[in-house]
């Protein structure tokens, strides 16, 4: 499955099917890391407001400025992501997920506006509404978080419903290889 991305600082006009394509990639990645669907949906609801789920999204109105935000979660400044990923960073969309994993594993980018660690967030079975709020306040942390909490929660709950009807694509070792390894071990 390939990412759908539009390099723009405007609304990329992503269709529902295009957003679902990117959601499938994101969900498979973080399910493989052990995240709950509640946490994944909360992150997706926030990402949809930040970037329309477009991994090549630049911050609106800043004319592709590196001092503005970029990517799924709008890393600000964009150098947070470019310095981490190095050459080819603008099209390394899987690398954005690796960056989030790195931040999660090292408790980076995470503030303490709400008393929950990034580790606890990822495995939480709290409500999607609560986790959307936690991700907004502890990760995104905009100046006026009240302006978009309702739409972020609506998005997150929609993605939670979607994820409940979407099986996880296989990642890692193919099942046939596991049987081959087991058979050789006899």
Language model features: what each stretch is:
Residues 1-41, 145-186:
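Extracellular cell-wall/glycan-interacting regions and their flexible linkers
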Residues 3-25, 32, 51-127:
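Peptidoglycan-targeting cell-wall enzymes and recognition modules
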Residues 27, 73, 138-140:
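Broad hydrophobic/π-residue packing in well-ordered secondary structure
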Residues 30, 83-85, 139, 143:
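Short amphipathic alpha-helical interaction patches enriched in hydrophobic/aromatic residues
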Residues 31, 35, 48-52, 105, ...:
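Hydrophobic/aromatic-lined pockets within catalytic cores
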Residues 38-54, 100, 134-136:
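Short, functionally critical alpha-helical segments immediately adjacent to catalytic or ligand/cofactor-binding
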Residues 44, 63-66, 150:
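Residue-level signal for the start and early helices of compact helical domains
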Residues 96-165:
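A charged, amphipathic interaction segment
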């Amino acid at each position: 499955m390939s990412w759908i991305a539009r390099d723009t600082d405007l609304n990329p006009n992503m269709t529902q099917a295009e957003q679902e394509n990117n959601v499938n990639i994101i969900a498979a990645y973080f399910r493989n890391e052990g995240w709950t669907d509640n946490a994944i949906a909360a992150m997706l609801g926030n990402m949809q407001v930040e970037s329309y789920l477009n991994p090549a999204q630049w911050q609106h109105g800043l004319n592709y400025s590196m001092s503005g935000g970029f990517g799924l979660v709008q890393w600000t400044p964009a150098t947070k992501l470019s310095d981490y990923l190095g050459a080819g960073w603008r099209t390394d969309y899987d690398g954005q997920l690796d960056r989030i994993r790195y931040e999660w594993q090292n408790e980076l980018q995470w503030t303490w506006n709400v008393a929950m660690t990034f580790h606890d967030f990822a495995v939480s079975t709290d409500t999607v509404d609560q986790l959307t709020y936690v991700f907004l306040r502890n990760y995104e942390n905009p100046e006026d978080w009240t302006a978009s909490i309702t739409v972020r929660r609506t998005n997150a709950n929609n993605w939670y419903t979607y994820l409940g009807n979407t099986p996880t694509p296989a990642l890692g070792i193919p099942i046939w290889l596991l049987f081959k390894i087991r058979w050789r071990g006899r």
